Each structure stands twice: as C-alpha cells, then as structure tokens.
Amino acid sequence: MSAPTPVLLMVRELDLGGSERQLAEMAMSLDRSRFDVRVGCFHAAGMRGEELRAAGVPIVEFPVPSLASFKGALRIAAYVREQGIRLVHTFDTSANLYGVPAARTAGTTRVISSQRADRALMPPLYRHGLRVTDHLVDAIVVNCEFVRRHMIEEEKAPAGLIHLCYNGIDTSVFRCIRGARPQGLQDASLVVGVVCALRPEKGLETLLDAFASIRGLEPGVKLVLVGSGPCLADLQHRARTLGILPDCLFEAATPRVAEWLQAIDLFVLPSLSEALSNSLMEAMACGCCAVASRVGGNPELVRHGETGMLFQPRDTAGLAQALRLLIHDGSLRGKLASQAACAIRSRFSREASAERMVEIYTGLLG
C-alpha cells in the first residue's frame, strides 16, 4: 500500500468562525490511510485548535504579522517543499491571499483555494487580490451554487476551475433531541431564535420587528439571539424601544451551539447576504423549524413549504406572517422540521462533504 498523500489545509486562525469550522471538520473527516493531513495557520490558539489536537491532527503555525510579511511566505514555501506536501488547500480570504502565492512557489504542489461568500461585500483591495490568486490555483472550491454562479458571472473565474462542495456538519452532535432548556428559557411556551454573529449583514432588526408584532399570539413565547458582534448594543436598544426586551434573551457566542439550537422551536435567519449558512444547516439538523430570507444559498437549504419557509430580505411583514402561521399550526411546524432534519442528514453531513472533497483532491492529484 502506498504512503498517505501529504496535504496541508490552511486558514488564518483556529477559533470560532464558519471557515475555521469547515477546515476542522474536513481535517478530522479525511481518511488518514489516504491523506497525511496537516493544518497550517497564522494563529494556532482557539477552540478549533483544541479540537484538532484532540483528534491527533498536526498543527503548523506560520507567524504572519501582516499580509505584507515576506518572511512568513518563505516559511510556508519552505515547509511545503521540505515536507513533500502534494496539495495545499486554503479555506479563507487571508489564507487565499497569502498562502496561495506562497504555496505556488513550491513547484509541483497542487493548490486549491476556497470561496465561501459573495465577494461584492469585500473591500475592493481584497477583491482585486483574490482575482489575482484565482489565476494561481488549480481549483476553486465553493460551498453553494449561489457562490459558483457569482464566481463565474461576476468574478469571471473560468468555469472549469470551480468545484462545488457543500459544507458538512457533524450530525452526531447536531441532532433532534429535546432536553431541558437553558437558563432563561425554562418557562417559555415556544422559542423563536437565531445563532449567528451579530453583524449588519445578518438583518437582525427585521427579526426583532417581526417578533414585536407577533409575541402576543402565544403566551410565554420568547426570542433568543445567541452570538456576539458589533451590533449587540444597537439590537438591545431596539428591543428595549420595541418593548420586547423582557421577552428577549441575548446570549454571547458559545461553543455550546447544539444545546442552544435544540432549545429553539422556530429558527429565523433574516440575512441580507449569505452564502451557505452553517448555523442554518445546524438548526435544521437539530429539529428546528427554519424560516430564512430568500438570499444567497438559503434557498438551497430551505425549500419553501417543504423543509421550511422563505421570505424576502427586510420584509418584516412577510416574516411576521410566516411566524404567525407556524406558531398557530404546530402540525405544520413539526412536519417542516422533520423533513428538514432528514434533508440535512442525507445531503449535508460531514461524511458527504468529505467524500466530495476527496473526489476533488484525487481528480487533481491524478
């Protein structure tokens, strides 16, 4: 039997974040008999680093004080050559901008980048830099059909370079179980909620406004927002102004994501922009009834009327209408939640994602 193929997966850091999570899931899911997986990063501290070490995945830190650091690039290139790395796969913007050129100088190594978001939201300098690195890679992996179209139609990337590999989640962790609700929600009759970063593009004002219009429908209904970010104070002020703060719970970002999702009945993702949302997939896997804005990759996860409900971004009335229907009709709520959980288990498990990525890797390695 031939020796496992050395591969290096790269990301800026190993803490909370969607790209960091997907890298960790992939590193732990790839067949060790076929791939000698190492993880490279600029900053090794963080929760994902702890998970990877516990799983026995080697972590190599390449200190990079800034993207202009030439020494850091030389270290990456030297490591790739010395270790005989045959494939380098970068998972986020910083790794794409810095790791791709460094790995390319190492010679025969195959280089893959990732695109997991709409580049229109990026600073122009970053977007230009990524367009340059698009011409240095052997493949670009995207996580949804929306991003694939964006890369071809707007970024003018060659269609043959683009490979679709949906994100995968650990369905042994994110599963349909209902236990005791966390503190602050024990007395709730029904919980509406979201788990996400509290950033402007998440459109969370729409959720607060819609909740204000429907909270009287069900005695004891509560709203929970789990996450941290720059919009926290503004969202709390808005909840206070709307008079709903007593029925709202703001919980900081936590690694106990599954526990919170399993306490939510109606998961609402009102994003203004989205690629493929890990939190939406995880919520559906946990048995939440999903309600999401019709943007980006959300419709690839939520089929309206089958695995959840969709509404137009910023449409407070449309979201409120969906919430009223689902609060009143428990049978429909349960049906949509059950069908969503089945869809996630069958199409978006980390095993399915790893199988697809292996197809991409082996196709490039020959």
What is the role of each PLM region?
Residues 253, 272:
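Aromatic "clamp/platform" in nucleotide-sugar-dependent glycosyltransferases that forms part
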